[in-house]
A protein has these predicted regions:
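Glycine-rich phosphate/diphosphate-binding loop of Rossmann-like nucleotide-binding domains
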Residues: 1-39
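Short, structured active-site "lid" loops
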Residues: 54-65
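Flexible gly/pro-rich beta->alpha loop and the following alpha-helix that scaffold active-site loops
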Residues: 66-88, 231, 248-253
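Short beta->alpha junction loops
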Residues: 38-48
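Proline/glycine-rich low-complexity loops and linkers
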Residues: 48-51, 58, 76-172
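Short alpha-helical segments enriched in small residues
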Residues: 117, 231, 235, 244-257
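Accessory alpha-helical/coil subdomains and C-terminal extensions
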Residues: 140-221, 231-236, 240, 246
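Glycine-rich beta-strand-to-loop/alpha-helix junction loops that act as flexible
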Residues: 8-10, 65-73, 151-152, 223
């Protein structure tokens, strides 16, 4: 399943905040064998966001968006998605009740008009619960186009990816991607590239070098269905052993996602 991430927010484009959402989603999707092909960042602009959706669905099957689900006028993601698919929005009343409760607890008085907007999702979509925030997400599918819409705050996004999105996507993908990384010190990247060229031209498994400060990481990855994990592991180990024979100083390391 070809996938694109669209991160929405002018604050991302002007450098006010670092886009950690794309990194987190990419790592999690890789672990379950979802093919991530593109990442796009767009500001809070209706026309440009709609154009991003149009372009994305010309080249991928699944789009996941983060950001733009709040109560203010520049939070436009849900409206643009509704426009693109020709659907309406509907309020999830229990999420609106949460907003009312928050206002009352903080003595803010009557809920602002954007409260109902924040608590809405696309009609005919699957609700994605948000247990650490006020804006729900949703999953929508039409004409073989799938979209997952998530809030932008990293704390909310990460909880929803782990507890809502990954279990959902595992229904659509039986693939798994296994990886092993070797660290090689004392050899320039260019020389490693020459020596391991035949490995780097492989397709599955894939072998790729990544220059790090003072060393080079060589990542071996192989994709297959979940029932073939033992086979995948054996193939990866075989290549790792071959590379260790060429570079005895190569050490296996764990890279955090």
């Amino acid at each position: 399943m070809k996938t694109e991430i669209i991160c929405v927010g002018t604050e991302l484009l002007v450098g006010d905040i670092v886009n950690t959402n794309a990194q987190y989603i990419s790592a999690k999707f890789t672990n379950i064998g979802i093919d991530l092909y593109y990442q796009t960042t767009v500001g809070d602009n209706y026309g440009r966001l709609k154009e991003c959706l149009e372009n994305a669905f010309k080249r991928v099957d699944l789009v996941i968006t983060t950001g733009g689900l709040g109560p203010t006028v520049d939070d436009i993601t849900k409206e643009v998605v509704a426009d693109y698919f020709g659907e309406e929005l509907e309020v999830i009343e229990r999420y609106y009740d949460l907003i009312v409760k928050k206002y009352n607890e903080r003595g803010f008085g009557e809920v602002a008009s954007g409260g109902r907007k924040e608590s809405s999702i696309l009609k005919n979509s699957k609700l994605l619960e948000n247990e650490v925030g006020l804006a729900p997400g949703f999953f929508y599918e039409k004409d073989n186009k799938k979209i997952i819409v998530l809030p932008g705050p990293p704390r909310e996004m990460t909880w929803m990816v782990d507890n809502q999105v990954l279990p959902l996507l595992k229904q659509y993908s039986n693939d798994v991607l296994l990886m092993k990384t070797l660290e090689i010190k004392g050899v320039p990247e260019g020389r490693i590239d020459d020596r391991l060229k035949d490995y780097f031209e492989m397709s599955n498994p894939t072998v790729a070098p990544y220059a790090k400060e003072g060393c080079v990481h060589v990542r071996i990855a192989m994709k297959g269905d979940r029932g073939s994990s033992d086979y995948l592991t054996a193939e990866i180990d075989k290549i790792a052993d071959e590379i260790k024979e060429i570079y005895p100083q190569a050490m296996e390391i764990k890279e955090d996602c």
